[in-house]
Every structure is written in C-alpha cells, then in structure tokens.
C-alpha cells in the first residue's frame, strides 16, 4: 500500500517534455499531416508537462488529478483500436513447402 505522500507522476517530467518536443518537431508534423490531413495537437503534452512540474514543485492535488486523468485517456485510446489482422494460433500446415513458380508469360 502506498503512503499518501509518495505518489509519483505516471511518467517522469522529462518524458512529457520529450513527447511535447517530438510532437512539435518538423518530421512529426509532416508525418501527422500526411496521415491525418491536419497538424497534431500538442497542447495535451504541454498541459501534462506543466502539471508534472507543478506536482514536483508544490504537490498540487489538481495537478495530480489532471495527470491521472490524462494517462487514463491515453490508455483507453490505445485500447479502443481493434487488431487489423487475425492472429494465428499456429503456422499454416504447408508453411515449409516451396512457393509456386511464376507462370511463363
């Protein structure tokens, strides 16, 4: 059981800073724009970084609550996507047979 004053942010503040900087990087912005058609929204990473620093400085309960909620939203967003491919339980029976040769044209 954790002691009341021993709570730590889910991630170190350096991780929030690195994620925020990555989100703002040119390569990430271009990739995100290419894939999604819009610029990435990096405000949540900045809010998390600010809350993490506030927690480290003043042990603010509001910052703690905000960080916990933000991480829960991230976990739920990652879990909502279904797998594209059906996972195999075992390889196909003919996996070791030679591949069919291309037909002559």
From Swiss-Prot:
Zinc as UniProt keyword: no
One annotated Gene Ontology cellular component of this protein: synapse
Coiled coil residues, start to end: none
Keyword match Transcription regulation: no
Highest taxon above the source species: Eukaryota
Keywords: Secreted, Synapse
Expressing tissues: In the postnatal brain, expressed diffusely throughout the hippocampus at a low level at 8 weeks (at protein level). At 16 weeks, strongly expressed in the stratum lucidum of the hippocampus (at protein level). In developing and aging brain, expression is strongest in hippocampus, especially in areas CA3 and CA2, throughout the dorsoventral axis.
Record's subcellular location: Synapse; Synaptic cleft
Main location per the UniProt record: other
GO biological process, one term: negative regulation of long-term synaptic potentiation
Entry function: Negatively regulates long-term potentiation and modulates adult synaptic plasticity. Stabilizes the interaction of RTN4 isoform A/Nogo-A with its receptors, inhibiting clustering of postsynaptic AMPA receptors at synaptic sites. Upon neuronal stimulation, degraded at synapses, reducing RTN4 signaling and allowing AMPA receptor clustering at individual synapses.
Name recorded for this polypeptide: Synaptic plasticity regulator PANTS
Organism: Mus musculus
């Amino acid at each position: 059981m954790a002691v009341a004053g021993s709570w730590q942010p889910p991630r170190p503040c350096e991780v929030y800073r690195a994620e925020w900087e990555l989100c703002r990087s040119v390569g990430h912005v271009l990739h995100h724009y290419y894939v999604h058609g819009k610029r990435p929204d990096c405000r949540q990473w900045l809010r998390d970084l600010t809350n993490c620093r506030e927690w480290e400085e003043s042990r603010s309960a509001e910052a703690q609550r905000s960080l916990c909620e933000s991480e829960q939203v991230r976990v739920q967003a990652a879990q909502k996507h279904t797998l594209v491919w059906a996972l195999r339980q075992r390889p196909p029976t003919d996996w070791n047979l030679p591949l069919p040769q291309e037909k002559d044209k």
